[in-house]
Amino acid sequence: MLRPPFALGVLFLLAMLPLASSVQVDAQNDEPAWRSVGLDPDLWTDRPVINESRTQMMVSYQGNAVIELNVSYQPGLVDERVEGTVVIELFENWAPITTNNMINHVESGLYDGVFFHRVVDNFVTQAGDPTCKTVGIYPAANPSCGSGGTGETIPLEHNDNLSHVDGAMGMARGAEEDSGDSQWYITDTEQHGLDPENRDDGGYAVFGIVRDGMTFVREIAS
């Protein structure tokens, strides 16, 4: 488990807002209220740097769920606490199993108060372990932090439109391909070595991307 030398924790709360046109739309009667909230993608300016060859991931798709990741961290022992929001679009259109898993965990409150337990500069920041919560004073945490989950796994899901571009959200897993649970990560710079075509172990599944707040991701990673 890797942590930056002076990081004092990253706590977050996720809430969902559906991607739509700039006008609000009505939700279906059997859908949660957040499905009726419209967003304007033009307001998102702090984006990842994405190669033009991956234009399909640069486009926002109407109807996809969007996560607001509220982060709070202290870069150094003498620095003031930084608070911000990272906006992430979930590609429900291309990764329905993985995004549905994420949405269910968000709605259940599984991630509330969890911190990033693995931080590697110029690679990934990883979170999603429900046991990774502060016990007493940070960085004191549950001894199982980093290896926890819900115990319910999902199959490895790939789509040709998705790859590990800068700011991609991917599903963490164990040695077995179909062992994804609740842990996920965000890439800090392109990490195509995690894509299935570049590995002999099945690779890792991408299911979302940062749309705003990438500066916070980079600060946490560094």
Give, region by region, the residue ranges found by the protein language model.
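Secretory targeting signatures
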Residues: 1-26
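Cyclophilin-like peptidyl-prolyl cis-trans isomerases
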Residues: 22-222
